[in-house]
């Protein structure tokens, strides 16, 4: 199981980076796309959604950075790697879903990068151990 720790951290870092990229794509989009004569980013709901995403990404980055530091020092547990993999891949799914929503119907078309990001996000919750397996490992680590 310990040999899977690096794999799960690689997945966590990749998922978080992909979520951050989706956020940046969407931030640019909501600043440029207009509706009713205003950038869609100027609407309260868009600002709230972007603020929520930015906050969750910041928290995720802090956790992943902490896990990386522990891994480099040989202190990262199987459970912590599972937490990082589970949390970041679920976060990626949530972020890409919200970002696609902010793109509206355009986000679902192949002409926009967010569409591909949304599709690609799904597999991260499967490879390297499913979300359910990560939760199982965390539960076992608590002695349950």
Enumerate the language-model features and the residues they cover.
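Alpha-helical interface subdomain recognition
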Residues: 2-144
């Amino acid at each position: 199981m310990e040999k899977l720790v690096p794999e799960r951290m690689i997945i966590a870092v990749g998922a978080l980076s992909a979520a951050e990229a989706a956020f940046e794509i969407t931030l640019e989009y909501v600043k440029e796309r207009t509706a009713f004569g205003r950038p869609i980013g100027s609407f309260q709901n868009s600002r709230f959604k972007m603020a929520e995403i930015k906050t969750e990404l910041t928290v995720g980055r802090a956790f992943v950075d902490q896990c990386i530091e522990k891994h480099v020092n040989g202190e990262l547990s199987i459970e912590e790697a599972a937490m990082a993999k589970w949390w970041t891949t679920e976060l990626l799914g949530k972020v890409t879903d919200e970002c696609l929503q902010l793109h509206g119907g355009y986000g679902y078309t192949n002409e926009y990068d967010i569409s591909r990001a949304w599709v690609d996000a799904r597999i991260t919750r499967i490879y390297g151990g499913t979300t359910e397996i990560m939760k199982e490992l965390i539960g076992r680590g608590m002695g349950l």
